[in-house]
């Protein structure tokens, strides 16, 4: 079983807006209710900016979500894999690619 949650960011930013916190909380709630579950957070950037900048922002976006899970929701950091994936191309609209995608992997059957 898996669950996905998408956290969006403003251009050039890697801080999680208050409006996005429910999407982080969904992940935290799931992890707290399923102690064997882990989450991969993949940060992405939209295409403007240099590759170096985009890779840094993408990683920072993943880390920002991880920080909230660890600090606010007391999720063990070892259950969270935060990755920067550079420029995203999942969505046709470039602006929509400013995201962290949280994919929960639940080993429970």
PLM feature segments, named:
Residues 19-21, 44-109:
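Periplasmic OmpA-like peptidoglycan-binding domain that tethers envelope proteins to the cell wall
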Residues 41:
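Conserved phosphate/oxyanion-binding catalytic-loop motifs
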Residues 1-38, 93-96, 100-109:
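Periplasmic peptidoglycan-binding/tethering modules of Gram-negative envelope proteins
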């Amino acid at each position: 079983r898996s669950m996905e949650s998408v956290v969006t960011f403003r251009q050039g930013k890697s801080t999680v807006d208050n409006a996005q916190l429910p999407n982080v909380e969904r992940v935290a709630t799931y992890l707290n209710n399923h102690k064997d579950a882990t989450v991969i957070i993949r940060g992405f950037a939209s295409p403007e900016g240099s590759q170096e900048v985009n890779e840094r922002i993408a990683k920072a976006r993943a880390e920002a979500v991880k920080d909230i899970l660890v600090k606010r929701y007391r999720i063990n950091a070892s259950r969270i894999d935060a990755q920067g994936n550079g420029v995203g191309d999942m969505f046709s609209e470039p602006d929509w690619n400013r995201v962290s995608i949280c994919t929960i992997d639940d080993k429970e059957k």
